[in-house]
């Protein structure tokens, strides 16, 4: 039905017949239901005992993972509110490297508790104000609970990496992997003028190999490039390498405009072939004149050019991935040549290029003092194994680097959430008005984390939360959390279950901002069909306008 307004006694049509509109409380219920559906899709993956999801793309590609951001990015979501929650995970991944599932789950719980407040006639503005106050106080309390990290404390930083990998594909070999990760971040860490530490993630690369055990993974100085020489007669390795990085095809230049040539005799054809060969020989000579004996080319290399490069004794690799070329610039302290005509000896850098014929990898090391870069060579039995291993190690790398830079860690196992929630309830007593109820709701939302950890471990979530609250009444027990492996409550900091403080602060920030953004919406205007059926109490997918695109990307 067309939306109408009356002006001077006459109806005015301002929306088309196909347009639909949902306002006020219906709009809030619609959005909250959509957001909760996304949060509930990943909450069962939280923690060491979390379950995996199988994602099947429209092309039939299968991904098995419990990585929150991977699941949400692969889901075929067709709802603007749900996409806001996906952005929470993406922001968390970009800013902190881990904690995506925690951030999304808390956002969903904040909206669930906000819905209860709305039913009690608490205005959205009061809820938003209360959530903002609570988020600010929560970040302050996280900092108060945090423990400072000595950059030389290898065991503690390894514990951060191991906590991140627990429950993921990297868990079984987490001791080996955490040691590799610690060495990697330390090798590229740089001390700043003010005494701080910065770890540039661009100086760490991950390469994967199938057909081996995870326990054969290793840390390499420099880069590992999964490529072959373009010609059999080329050297397989060059110890004293002079390397040129090239982003220009070593091929015959094509005419800028479409042209046609009539060839009337074999001599004419030979003339064209000779001209092409001359162009290729000139390009190869340009490379040789720079003094380079190794070329990593991002684009193609003509067969004839390969022949002449081999005659010059130059090792050449074609179609090197852009990401590998960029990493090689760090490893070699080199720049990329984009125009061979302008190439010179200054573009060539010294290094070492060796070859592992079994793994079909080039190992590249730089010699400059400004050269940086290490490679984690991860091995696994199958593609699925190494893909999940890479995701787990990537997250662990990020949180280890964050810990080294930020210098603060927190007890895991829900200890931080319960302690901060307890302090927020004390803070709520100082908040006047209905905002106090929102602060208390925020505290309740944080406690979702220990509840879900217990739930996913097959424990009673209510009993676990009650026991944790009781333990945290003692000022000396702020590190008491749930050991999901044993089912006992213990000092998780002493047990080595630790998390980076920055990731927890970012999770609080991302979750609260997303919840407030959803709560501010009181009107939805759609040009097409807009379903407004609410989901069930568990945040079912009903109520998501257009649904979730046929489910979670084919997830079964």
UniProtKB/Swiss-Prot annotation:
Gene Ontology biological process terms from the UniProt entry: protein folding
Biased amino acid composition, Gly residues: 540-556
UniProt-listed InterPro entries: Chaperone_TCP-1, Chaperonin_TCP-1_CS, Cpn60/GroEL/TCP-1, GroEL-like_apical_dom_sf, GROEL-like_equatorial_sf, TCP-1-like_intermed_sf, TCP-1_chaperonin, thermosome_alpha
Molecular function terms, GO-annotated: ATP binding; ATP hydrolysis activity; ATP-dependent protein folding chaperone; unfolded protein binding
Record carries keyword Nucleotide-binding: yes
Disulfide bonds: none
A Pfam family this chain is assigned to: Cpn60_TCP1
Record keywords: ATP-binding, Chaperone, Nucleotide-binding
Region (Disordered) location: 530-556
Assembly and interaction partners: Forms an oligomeric complex of eight-membered rings.
Assigned protein family: Belongs to the TCP-1 chaperonin family.
Function: Molecular chaperone; binds unfolded polypeptides in vitro, and has a weak ATPase activity.
Protein name stated in the entry: Thermosome subunit beta
Species per Swiss-Prot/TrEMBL record: Halobacterium salinarum (strain ATCC 700922 / JCM 11081 / NRC-1) (Halobacterium halobium)
Gene symbol of the encoding locus: thsB
